[in-house]
Regions:
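Bacterial N-terminal signal peptides
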Residues: 15-26
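Mature extracytoplasmic or otherwise solvent-exposed domains
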Residues: 31-181
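Bacterial N-terminal signal peptides that target proteins for export
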Residues: 3-15
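Well-ordered, non-transmembrane segments within structured domains
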Residues: 2-4, 30-31
């Protein structure tokens, strides 16, 4: 009889522990990040700046936001006689990133904010005259000079414990609040 009682207590303890584990994981799964205000993007030349993103429900584990941008570069070509001609083909710019930035939620009861997140594209290695669409059939005598760098698209990811909790895509000329990923 004692053996039976010990076995019963042990199985009840294991069952209770299993139920507790299920309850804990399901409550974590049901917890969701609430977006109080969506971050808005402002495009200016080679840069994109995000402001105004407010989140709650993040808990006390620091959430990270990272903004990446892509864009293009335009060039002017100058021939050996000194005459400038705009290139006809934009060239992809080097992508840029804000790097991961904490939202401050671990210090503010689970509320996090994107106050001023900025990333910029950079000039790629100088292309050839042929790549930018001037200089005929690959003449190496043309001088290629950077004209403009333009950020054209941005991608925001908010992660917590390496899990994506919020994502937006932004486009030059598109809605300031972007679109869901």
């Amino acid at each position: 009889m004692r053996k039976f009682l010990r076995m019963t207590r042990k199985s009840m303890w294991l069952t209770g522990a299993a139920l507790l584990a299920v309850a804990a994981t399901s409550s974590i799964a049901l917890a969701a990040v609430n977006v109080k205000s969506e971050p808005t993007a402002s495009f200016s030349g080679a840069s994109v700046t995000l402001t105004g993103g407010e989140f709650s429900g993040l808990g006390n584990i620091e959430a990270q936001a990272e903004l990446t941008v892509t864009g293009s570069a335009t060039y002017t070509c100058t021939n050996p006689q000194g005459h400038a001609s705009p290139g006809q083909n934009p060239v992809p710019a080097q992508p840029g990133s804000s790097g991961p930035v904490g939202l401050g939620n671990s210090e503010h009861n689970g509320r996090g904010t994107i106050s001023n997140l900025k990333a910029s594209v950079a000039a790629p290695p100088t292309p050839s005259a042929k790549q930018v669409g001037c200089g005929g059939t690959g003449s190496t005598k043309w001088t290629v000079t950077l004209d403009t760098l333009t950020a054209e698209a941005a991608h925001l990811e908010v992660t917590q414990r390496n899990k994506l909790v919020f994502c937006r895509n932004y486009a030059l000329g598109g809605a300031a609040t972007g679109t869901a990923c």
